[in-house]
From Swiss-Prot:
It is a single-pass type I membrane protein. Expressed in the cervicothoracic ganglion (stellate ganglion) (at protein level). Residues 564-612 are cytoplasmic. Residues 598-612 are annotated as: Required for the interaction with kinesin heavy chain and for anterograde transport in axons. This is Amyloid-beta precursor-like protein. It is found in: Cell membrane; Cell projection, Axon. Residues 22-542 are extracellular. One of its GO terms (molecular function) is heparin binding. Residues 130-189 are annotated as: CuBD subdomain. The chain crosses the membrane at residues 543-563.
Amino acid sequence: MGPSVRPGFLVVVIGLQFVAASMEVNSRKFEPMVAFICNKPAMHRVPSGWVPDDDPAKSCVKQPEEILEYCKKLYPDHDITNVLQASYKVTIPNWCGFNVTHCHKHGNHTVRPFRCLVGPFQSEALLVPEHCIFDHYHDPRVCNEFDQCNETAMSKCSARGMTTQSFAMLWPCQEPGHFSGVEFVCCPKVSLIPESTEAPKSSPPTPAKTENGLDDYTAYLKGDSKYMSKYANEHERFKAAEKVMQQFQRERDTKMMKDWKAARDSVREKKKTDPKKAMELNKELTERYQKIYHAYEQESIAEKKQLVNTHQQHIQSWLNNRKQVLMEKLQDALLAKPPKKSKIEKAATAYIKVEEKDKMHTYNHFQHLRDTDPEDAANIQDRVLEHLNLIDDRIRRVLDWLKRDPEIEKQVRPNIDKFMAKYKDINANSMKLLLRQEPTPKEAPVETQKAEDYSEEDEAAVTGTANKVKPTEARPEQQEDIKTPGFDSETFEDERPAIAEQTIHDLPNHRKKGYIAHVQQQPMIADEVSLDNLYANSHANSVLGIAIGGVVVFIIIVVAVVMLKRRTQRQRVTHGFVEVDPAASPEERHVANMQMSGYENPTYKYFEMQNQ
């Protein structure tokens, strides 16, 4: 009988384990909520749905303090710290009145429930669509409720001529249900690019598409699940999407330049027969392609910002999810009976480690933004500091949780402090760089020369590089030795090589490592449209070099001729000595000495006169 019963017992055990695992997964996704409609039972959320409360006193609760106490009463196993009205609405079925069990006809009600927040407050990650902007408003002196924060976000977007896409609370106050800031996403009411702007007739080639019909760039922006599983981590997904975006922009700009050069060639031919008409056509051509160029320029900037914002959102979402999981593990370890020191220490250090990763990512992103777009970096510097302060506050709250059990705190706190000491110097150096004020670059004067052919002037007019591009002094970048901890297997990506590579590509003056020069132009388009100017400058430099070389050679020849002529005219100096044949007789030597003294032999003189 024993062997026949054992398989059935194993099936029951495995089934119970499966049910327990399913309940654990569902509890991870479960978020406590309550909803109220006056004269109807209060509803609270459970993993299986919504459950009514027959207590009439809880039917019409409105004050945040009362709602917080109600949440703590309904969910005693959760650490409820605050309440927040949801930014979305939910439909609750079968919401009947008191003493009514079924009301199918009029039982569905759509309300905005209240979220019972568990653990430390964390602001939501907002999606930033294309051509939209993300901003925030924070006044620590004022604490507002949900509706007032909503009005603040709408007024801020309305002041920009935009509409509010979404918003979320930024920082909680001491009073439940009140917050001292709001973050929001504003979107334009109309399209960014005017419809009247003419674009090239033929569209640029389409990048290669994935198996589901989307290219890497589009799939990345849409968050396609199949695309997400194609790459190992977020860094690879971002680089693949960026590569496709840059390819698309290059092909689009190259096509525009080809069309423009073809139109310029037609104007040159027209100039031979009708110069006046050619001038008019050239002016019209310049204005038209100037609009196209600036439209493409703005579109490229918007696409790059959208890609970077999506990348930041993915990373922040990963970090927030990881924090939530580790926070729940820490809470479970603290509430365990009896609490285990090893689990508490492991959960606390893991959570602090993720928070420190969030810090390092924020530092790296801000430094990259400061190198590529100083103006945008200056605009978000205050928000970056607030984000870092929020991280520090959450870490302090986790450490305060340990104080609930002094014995456990005494055992695990030294190891946690030792672990946090690894990041102390890193945070200090990073904060020093973050608060560093960038000096204003000195602008150097730009000398321009008027070209004889108006087509080259039109090129500068279209691209806007004739007067807008102002070279600045290249200065060595003040690099500080910041030792960053190694990225372990839990890390989603190591962004530092990507940031360095992106900085080099984005800044046209980054030719050598350690130098920064800000140039006020769109590098990719401006480099392509200035090919004619580069060729003209190269030709002029070649002619000038040949002329200078010819003059130098001519001077060398003249000097050589003069020196040679002077040398041939130089007389031989004997200094009173005459070379005498060593084999001569003493008489011949005596005669030679007499001749050297001025004596002339009469016999020789006689014969010389006879020969003449």
